[in-house]
């Protein structure tokens, strides 16, 4: 397949056309050029030749590596979930947050292709956006009676049913599902105590939620610096969080309840103007529509075109850390060891962090790795049955919210 890669191509053009080449850059010490931030700011203007010359890397040899990677690893995204019942035949089901589905799916698909070629191991996997399954799939999980109805490896996003007491008591306590390995935590994960001390759940990464202020809509109000600040009465009907169609994001509601109880939930509801998907929030800000403050994943904050209009606030008490969790059937750990090693390894972690999702790995370098995180806490997660608690929170929040 002709690639037409040459030294005058911009790095952005190469990665956009051939995303499977990202790891050629990373493994040759050029990972900083293909992070999410660099792809937005630097890569659209930096040519391949200039980047390689500045690091004394042979251009012809590097292009050969790029072309070899493209030939051996055509981009094939991991397929989605065909049906609820089909999950029992899967080695892995991934329910990923928006923003992570595509980079995870492509990287994992490339890994599976290499695994099959090298070791003859064929893995059945499906990757879905968590938002597509948030209501339907998690309700279905609550009807499952046997571990045989579930995939061998489950990767899921947010504070979901897998952390609820029914799943925990039925599948985790008896040892049917467990974590894979205890990862050494970097400073932000260690400070927030995000890793499970009981080693029953593996945290692959977290989706950090931040506050984005539309400076045109502040009306002389001071910018918030903590999560408690956005509950102040001055922000009445000024706040937009993820939600819509009778649903609001519990990754925001749960920490508010933990910190301030029902009074905090009432204050939050009074300040919410509307519930939107983060992509809709980006549109709203770019069109300078209503709303002064937006709670959204940091990934989406970087996609706002009118950066001059906004202030991204990483709160002093940390971005809200919404987890991406891995669980595996205990009986499958040895059989699926190559897959599990990849999922918790530094290679995938660098991709996740580069996409704006902090990882526990102390050896991974990215801007998000240095910023504080705010975690619900494992005592809170184990003491409370999250699905039941979410219902109780909604009883207070929903009648007061738009």
Identify the role of each PLM range:
Residues 74-164:
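Early extracytoplasmic/lumenal segment of secretory-pathway proteins
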Residues 80-109, 157-286:
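Extracytoplasmic ligand-binding site segments that recognize negatively charged/polar headgroups
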Residues 85-87, 334, 342-402:
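Extracellular/periplasmic juxtamembrane helices and adjacent flexible linkers that interface
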Residues 147-156, 237, 287-296:
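Alpha-to-beta junction loops
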Residues 161-163, 291-310:
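A ligand-binding cleft/hinge motif common to bilobed small-molecule-binding domains
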Residues 193, 266-275, 307-330:
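Periplasmic-binding protein-like
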């Amino acid at each position: 397949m002709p690639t037409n890669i040459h030294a005058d191509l911009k790095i952005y053009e190469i990665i956009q056309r051939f995303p499977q080449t990202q790891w050629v850059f990373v493994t040759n010490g050029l990972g900083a050029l293909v992070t999410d931030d660099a792809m937005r700011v630097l890569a659209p203007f930096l040519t391949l030749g200039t980047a390689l010359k500045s690091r004394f890397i042979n251009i012809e040899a590097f292009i050969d590596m790029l072309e070899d990677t493209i030939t051996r690893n055509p981009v094939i995204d991991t397929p989605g979930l065909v049906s609820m019942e089909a999950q029992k035949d899967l080695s892995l089901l991934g329910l990923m947050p928006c923003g992570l589905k595509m980079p995870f799916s492509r990287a994992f698909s490339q890994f599976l292709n290499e695994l099959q070629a090298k070791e003859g191991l064929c893995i059945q996997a499906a990757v879905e956006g968590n938002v597509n399954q948030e209501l339907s799939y998690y309700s279905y999980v609550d009807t499952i009676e046997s571990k045989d109805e579930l995939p061998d490896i489950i990767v899921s996003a947010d504070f979901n049913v897998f952390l609820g007491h029914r799943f925990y008591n039925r599948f985790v306590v008896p040892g049917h599902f467990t974590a894979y390995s205890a990862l050494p935590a970097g400073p932000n994960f260690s400070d927030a105590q995000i890793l499970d001390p009981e080693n029953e759940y593996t945290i692959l990464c977290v989706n950090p939620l931040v506050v984005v202020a539309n400076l045109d809509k502040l009306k002389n109000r001071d910018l918030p610096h903590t999560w408690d600040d956005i509950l102040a009465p001055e922000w009445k009907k000024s706040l937009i969080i993820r939600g819509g169609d009778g649903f609001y994001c519990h990754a925001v509601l749960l920490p508010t309840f933990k910190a301030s109880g029902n009074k905090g939930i009432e204050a939050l509801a009074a300040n919410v103007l509307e519930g939107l998907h983060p992509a809709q929030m980006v549109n709203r800000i770019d069109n300078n529509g209503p709303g002064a403050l937006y709670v959204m994943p940091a990934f989406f904050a970087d996609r706002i075109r009118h950066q001059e209009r906004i202030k991204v606030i990483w709160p002093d008490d940390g971005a809200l850390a919404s987890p991406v969790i891995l669980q595996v059937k205990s009986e499958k750990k040895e059989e699926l060891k190559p897959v599990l090693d990849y999922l918790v390894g530094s290679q995938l972690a660098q991709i996740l962090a580069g996409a704006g999702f902090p990882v526990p790995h102390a050896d991974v370098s990215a801007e998000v790795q240095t910023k504080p995180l705010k975690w619900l806490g494992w005592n809170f997660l184990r003491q409370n049955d999250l699905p039941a608690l979410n219902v109780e929170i909604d009883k207070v929040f929903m009648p007061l919210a738009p």
